Amino acid sequence: MVYIQDNISVKDIFDNIEYYTDLFLEHGILIFKKLNPTRQEEWDLMKSFGDRIGWFPNSTVKGEPRLPYLSTEDEGHQTTFNRFDHAILADELFIDWHIERAERENFQTGALWHMRKFECNPDSGQTGFINMISFFEHMPKDWQDFLIKCKVCSLSQPNELGVFTDVEFSESLPQRYIVISHYSNKKPIYRPSLSTTDFLTKVDDLPPSVEDLKLFEEIRQWTIDQTVDSPNNQTWFKWSVGDTMIIDLSLMAHAVKGGFNLGERSFSRIWAHRYSFDIIE
């Protein structure tokens, strides 16, 4: 479930930060219509949430807003537009379904996105979500028990434009557990690669058996059917100028639809990570 709040100020959030932190942990995403925070308020909000749920930036991160937490340029999707030689319609995917940086150890656990420019059709550029904690909870129990023991690697890797291309398996490819514990509430999160292919490498730290491989492939296909190919399991949000979203990227699979042109839609971004990038002395 996506939580949407209207008619609220930045001060209201700070004055009730415990309440909104609890809502965030419950829903995985908070959307504040027409909140329109300043850039300093964006930074302060993310640090305040970080103090309570355990991501960085938080109050231990001193100084001005900065990389790698802050994106210094607003996102207008120039790189994504460069991938296409044709217009992407409003009912087509502009950015495929994915879980942010599933392959990284210090993956992005959260983000604040503030739509600063939106000069396209109101139905264009929608962002879709699937809560992968809830998704995992509704899977058969024997599948859950199996997936918790699985390590995988991705057989697609991004190039300099972020376009994924198929690669051969090698031991040097990053490997990860496909189910991890949430950094704050410890609930299990299912984090498959929804737009690329995961390869099963270990089950309970042992090489997978033929039966393991068959079961994993069955679950993988079912997952795609129930996420990417199942609109009924997706929630889509229509943006307007000033809308501000705080999202738990560790658990929210997301995608973006087209229908807009380069320069019509842009938003500011602050990223939260599981671990600090600062050197602690």
Which stretches of residues belong to each language-model region?
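Non-heme Fe(II) oxygenase catalytic core, chiefly the N-lobe of the double-stranded beta-helix
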Residues: 1-243, 251-281
